[in-house]
Amino acid sequence: DTVPRDENGVYAVPKEQILSESRSVYGGVTELFPFLEFPDTGVKAVRCSRFMSVMGFTGVYFACVGESNVNVDSPACLLPSTIAHELAHQRGVAWEQECNFLGVLASVTSGMPDYIYSGWLLGFIHLGNALYETDPEAYWVIRGTLPAAVEADLRDNSAYWDQFRDNVVEKVSDTVYDAALKSYGDANGMKSYSMVVELLVAYYKDLI
């Protein structure tokens, strides 16, 4: 872990730096998959990011104008991988599970420490959530082996999002967004976000 941290041990890379580096995040992954090469225009920070958090969103892609927008109120540790996710949409990738996969892969192959860390953190969260659903005890055993810095970020991220859970706006937003995804042809709706686990396992099982 080579990223800057604050006095509480939490990821403290300036969000302005993360945003400015966004145009380079796909440099590594395009060497593996050249069809992903695309003239990146970067992403935009949403002014009403706090409201995005109330709705449960970390990013949104406006296909009509080809613009990726990200929530800059939420913890910075997952901002790089969120940016990589939204930039996958710019490349014509529609399904959320595929964008989540590219969010991880592009970040960890970017060559930038702040993005690499964020990508692995996002990957752990998805894989960890899947493990927790089937074997909570195994999950906590593995989580107990994580470095203190990673644990600090997981706790900070959870504490941030806990304040917005179960509010009316988030519930309505989830219902509407789930319906929207299904109307676009994604039968799994919101569940598609967590299906990235299958892609991560399929890709990395032969590399470990």
Show the residue positions of the predicted features:
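Intrinsically disordered or highly flexible coil/loop and linker segments, enriched in small
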Residues: F35, E133-E137, G185-G189
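Pan-zinc metallopeptidase signature
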Residues: V150-I208
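Solvent-exposed, acidic/flexible segments
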Residues: K15, V72-P80, G92-E96, D114-Y117, ...
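Amphipathic, soluble alpha/beta structural segments
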Residues: S81-T82, E86, S110, G119-H126, ...
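Generic structural signal for hydrophobic core residues of well-folded globular domains
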Residues: S74, L87, R91, G128-L131, ...
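Active-site/pore-lining binding-face segments in mid-to-C-terminal subdomains
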Residues: F101-A152
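Auxiliary, metal-adjacent structural segments of Zn-dependent hydrolase domains
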Residues: T2-V72, A76
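Active-site recognition of the HExxH zinc-binding catalytic motif
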Residues: S81-N100, V104-L105
